[in-house]
Amino acid sequence: LGDVYKRQEPVLLQQPLLSRYDKHNREMKHVYGYMRGKKKKTEFERYAMQCFPNFYERAMQVRSQLSENLYYKEHSGQTKDVCHGEYNYHNLLLTKSGLATTNFEHAAPGVQLLDMAYFMRKVMEKNKWQVEKGVVLWNGYCEGAGCSKKELEFLITILSYPIKYWKLLNQYINSKKTWISNKSMEKLKAVCEQEESKDKFLQQMRTFTLGTSQKA
């Protein structure tokens, strides 16, 4: 499975994370303004507006923290590392010879720890941010790649960003706002309701040890 996917075209640089967050934050504010201006609001719009202040404040805090993050400053300008771009369990295959990764369409030079953050967020959302699951993931990362305090702080910062909330608002505004599926409403409620559990998990993450493979 080593040749499951061979990239033929040149790999493009990922959009800088700070620029991406700036764009997301502007989009969230724009969608909120649109919803607020509507006279007749749907259940989705009312609920999204109710959750907005907390999520937007968090998004702005993350942007500020990231601009001062040491790990990001050290790695954001490097292009020698390649990110998968969509590293989750759907793109992993368990074979007789070990674990294989597939689907490299989004691969690009970038901060490699973002793959870990993406994978961890997907798993933790499915498990309602259970601390025990997070400990297993973090220990597995430390055992395989080594870990440092700077990496842990970067990971916490990335996981803090309300990316799922932004995604739902973005889908809403791009769907011409004419019809919101029940599935979207369920996802929005889940994101808002899980925020307390997510906060507790992120607080607990700050106490995680760096394992035996500690890096400087």
What are these regions (language model features)?
Residues K29, Y165-A216:
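ATP/Mg2+ or Mg2+-diphosphate-binding catalytic cores
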